[in-house]
């Protein structure tokens, strides 16, 4: 569980993280300020424009590199998840590690087919003179807001799909499981993903609200109904899907 304290400066929140299994302190983190979030969004937009130009086949190759990194670091990932959530090792392995590898392989294999241009037939007396094609384009920056109960898999799964489609990602993990979310950023960097393509902001609900204030191009949310309603209302002000 996470406990927030206010620093002496009075404007910077510090998160002290305790393991629910034995209540020992497992980390201290500075929460992102509004200026930090603005900077993160700015860097994400720059990274996304470059990433959108990368051919899909190379985006898929990145996912296979990430699989290798996860396998090489599976013990560390499981330890972080277990410390933050109190999960037993079997659940950490099956829900977080196996599921992440499965998602990476699944979407990397199918994305080239799902995202390729599609020819469509038209209706009408002059349809034989017309040609129609559907082309999929990246949305831009995707904000991924995740809960505590599947902190690694629920962060990496929407990240995989977003990146394959040519988007960049900013993850806002639960304040009680920030390290698991931060692992996703670290793992993609270890797999040689471009700098700032995947970023993480640490903070409470206010940080999540401030992230949406920066108007990402899409929001992926998993969590409670109450929080979902707040996010949906906030997104509706800027028509964010």
Located regions from the model:
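Conserved small-residue-rich beta-alpha loop and adjacent elements
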Residues: 121-194, 238-240
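N-terminal Rossmann-like NAD(P)+-binding subdomain of aldehyde/semialdehyde dehydrogenases
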Residues: 1-130
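Active-site-adjacent beta-strand anchor residues
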Residues: 30, 145, 170-174, 201, ...
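Short alpha-helical
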Residues: 35, 72, 76, 87, ...
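Conserved NAD(P)+-binding/catalytic subdomain of aldehyde/semialdehyde dehydrogenases
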Residues: 141, 192-241
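Alpha-helical structural signal in soluble globular domains
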Residues: 65-69, 80, 101-108, 187-191, ...
């Amino acid at each position: 569980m996470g406990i927030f304290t206010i620093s002496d400066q009075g404007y910077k929140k510090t998160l002290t993280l305790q393991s629910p299994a034995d209540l020992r302190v497992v980390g201290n983190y500075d929460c992102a300020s509004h200026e930090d979030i603005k900077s993160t969004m700015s860097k994400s937009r720059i990274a996304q424009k470059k990433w959108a130009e990368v051919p899909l086949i190379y985006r898929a190759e990145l996912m296979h590199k990430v699989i290798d990194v996860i396998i090489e670091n599976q013990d560390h990932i499981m330890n972080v998840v277990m410390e933050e959530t109190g999960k037993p090792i079997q659940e950490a392995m099956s829900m977080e590690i196996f599921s992440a590898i499965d998602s990476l392989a699944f979407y990397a294999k199918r994305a080239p087919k799902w995202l390729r241009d599609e020819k469509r037939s038209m209706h009408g007396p002059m349809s034989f003179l017309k040609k129609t094609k559907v082309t999929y384009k990246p949305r831009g920056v995707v904000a991924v807001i995740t809960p505590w109960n599947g902190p690694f898999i629920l962060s990496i799964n929407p990240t995989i799909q977003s990146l394959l489609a040519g988007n960049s990602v900013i993850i806002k993990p639960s304040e009680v499981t920030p390290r698991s979310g931060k692992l996703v950023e670290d793992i993609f960097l270890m797999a040689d993903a471009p700098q700032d393509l995947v970023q993480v902001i640490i903070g409470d609900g206010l940080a999540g609200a401030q992230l949406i204030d920066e108007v990402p191009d899409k929001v992926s949310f998993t969590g409670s109904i109450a929080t979902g309603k707040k996010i949906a209302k906030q997104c509706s002000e800027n028509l964010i899907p």
